[in-house]
């Protein structure tokens, strides 16, 4: 199911069993009814449902976004400022490390695009295309344009933003963090702000005196390696031209371009480049606790992994009592829709406490 906004809690009833859903905060969500049935009733209070697709038992197509929860402990944390930055400036990192090598790459955005409802969908579509499977973190900070760092600082509560970045590091415990060019890529003040904040966050995340609330919740953590796009010192040039088996022989660059193509609204302004001023291959090691790179082009060179393999998050489950509590909050209005298996249909309506009944024939 694809929602217009992150849904409130809702229920799915199948074979007399009621599941509580909508607790993950996913905009695109796969629900597996607890009991096989030819009739499924979905109760959606005050929610806009854009698309729903039904499948028979078996493996889902690769194009279906069956998101996992954000990692408990990731290998790499990417910190793009806006939706699409992760492809334009970080290029082949996600296709290679997440898609090809199967490493735990967590993406967390400094700003959100809830004021442009189509962009969060583009964000998810792009990430899925390049091999990201852990749901991204999207901050509460709105997107504003700025042409200078000092101006950008006036647009936000920078202490609150710094707390956010410190908490991300402590929560996800990445061995490697990647962020923007210090000069804001093309001069965007909020890109500059993002990196200015990270430069402080990597120094503070290991000290419990800074932001003690997140230190108490997640513990402290010191990142081993911090890379910045286009940073001129300790340069790393990423190989984005080697064919990747996970993507049928496409290169990391080609996959990055395909990921950015999902950001339909941004195509006339930007592109993914592997040369020139905004070369997506070029990074520099800004901070390290494990020594300098040798030049082999691997972000994880010299890194020591201390975490155990991350278990797959459990599929959404809840007790029938909790589900019933949610269902009680909604009205008895019923909208019945019939569909054959694997059939797409669009529901551009606000379901204010409505019940969607899917009859499978």
Describe the function of each predicted region.
Residues 5-16, 22-33, 67-68, 204-332, ...:
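The feature marks non-catalytic terminal segments
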Residues 351-361:
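C-terminal membrane-anchoring or membrane-association module
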Residues 96-100, 147, 241, 246, ...:
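Residue-level signature of transmembrane alpha-helix interfaces in integral membrane proteins
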Residues 335-343:
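Short, Lys/Arg-rich cytosolic juxtamembrane segment immediately N-terminal
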Residues 95, 139, 214, 238-240, ...:
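Generic alpha-helix signal with a bias toward terminal, lower-confidence helices
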Residues 3-9, 16-211:
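Active-site beta-strand->loop->alpha-helix modules in alpha/beta enzyme cores, enriched
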């Amino acid at each position: 199911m694809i929602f217009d906004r992150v849904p409130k809690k809702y229920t799915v009833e199948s074979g007399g069993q009621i599941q509580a859903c909508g607790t993950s905060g996913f905009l695109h969500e796969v629900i597996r009814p607890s009991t096989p049935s030819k009739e499924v009733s979905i109760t959606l209070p005050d929610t806009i449902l854009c698309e729903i697709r039904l499948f028979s038992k078996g493996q889902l197509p690769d194009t279906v976004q069956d998101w996992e929860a954000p990692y408990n402990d990731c290998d790499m944390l990417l910190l793009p400022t806006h939706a699409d930055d992760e492809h334009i400036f970080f290029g082949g990192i996600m296709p290679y490390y997440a898609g090809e090598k199967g490493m735990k790459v967590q993406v967390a955005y400094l700003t959100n695009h809830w004021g442009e409802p189509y962009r969060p969908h583009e964000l998810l579509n792009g990430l899925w295309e390049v091999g990201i499977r852990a749901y991204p973190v999207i901050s509460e900070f709105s997107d504003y344009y700025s042409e200078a760092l000092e101006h950008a600082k006036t647009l936000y509560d920078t202490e609150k933003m710094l707390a956010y970045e410190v908490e991300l590091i402590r929560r996800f415990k990445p061995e490697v963090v990647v962020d923007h060019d210090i000069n804001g890529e093309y001069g965007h003040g909020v890109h500059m702000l993002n990196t200015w904040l990270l430069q402080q966050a990597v120094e503070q995340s290991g000290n419990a005196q800074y932001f003690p609330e997140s230190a108490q919740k997640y513990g402290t953590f010191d990142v081993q390696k911090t890379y910045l796009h286009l940073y001129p010192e300790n340069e790393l040039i990423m190989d984005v031209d080697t064919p990747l088996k996970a993507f049928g022989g496409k290169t990391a660059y080609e996959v990055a371009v395909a990921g950015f193509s999902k950001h339909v609204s941004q195509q006339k302004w930007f592109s993914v480049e592997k040369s020139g001023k905004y070369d997506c291959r070029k990074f520099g090691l800004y901070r390290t606790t494990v020594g300098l790179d040798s030049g082999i082009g691997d972000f994880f060179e010299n890194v020591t992994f201390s975490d155990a393999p991350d278990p797959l998050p459990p599929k959404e489950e809840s007790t029938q009592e909790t589900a019933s509590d949610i269902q009680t909050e909604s009205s008895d209005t019923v909208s019945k829709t019939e569909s054959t298996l694997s059939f797409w249909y669009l529901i551009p309506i606000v379901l204010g406490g409505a019940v969607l009944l899917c009859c499978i024939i």
